A protein has these predicted regions:
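Conserved short "hinge" loops at termini or chain/domain junctions
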Residues: 1-75
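Domain-terminus/edge residues, biased toward the C-terminal soluble/receptor-binding domains
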Residues: 46-58, 73, 77-103
Length: 103
């Protein structure tokens, strides 16, 4: 929506547990078309809660891969598109969908 204000994205990164990828707030804002009216003080906690929820849901998956010697989602597959493998992309998609639904 045009409102005369230039879009400024939050360049912060939310660090994750080590297995799943970190989340860049700007990537969420761009991919999910988050309106300017939703400020950073609302976005960050919602993303953190979404990350925590998805991490809980994927505990068994993470444990399975760790037992196979895989230390991070980046190592799950060697097939990369635009710098990410399918596990990283799907993780971010799940987090972003949850966060946007809560906003």
């Amino acid at each position: 929506m045009f409102n005369g204000r230039a879009r400024e994205y939050n360049t912060d990164t939310i660090s994750n547990s080590g297995f799943w990828p970190h989340i860049e707030i700007a990537e969420f804002q761009k991919q999910r078309a988050i309106p300017l009216q939703i400020n950073d003080q609302m976005i960050r906690p919602v993303l953190i809660a979404a990350m925590q929820g998805v991490n809980i849901d994927l505990q068994a998956v993470e444990q399975h891969y760790k037992e196979m010697g895989i230390k991070s989602a980046a190592q799950i597959s060697n097939d990369y598109i635009d710098g990410e493998n399918y596990a990283e992309t799907l993780y971010k998609k799940a987090v972003f969908a949850r966060a946007k639904a809560e906003l």
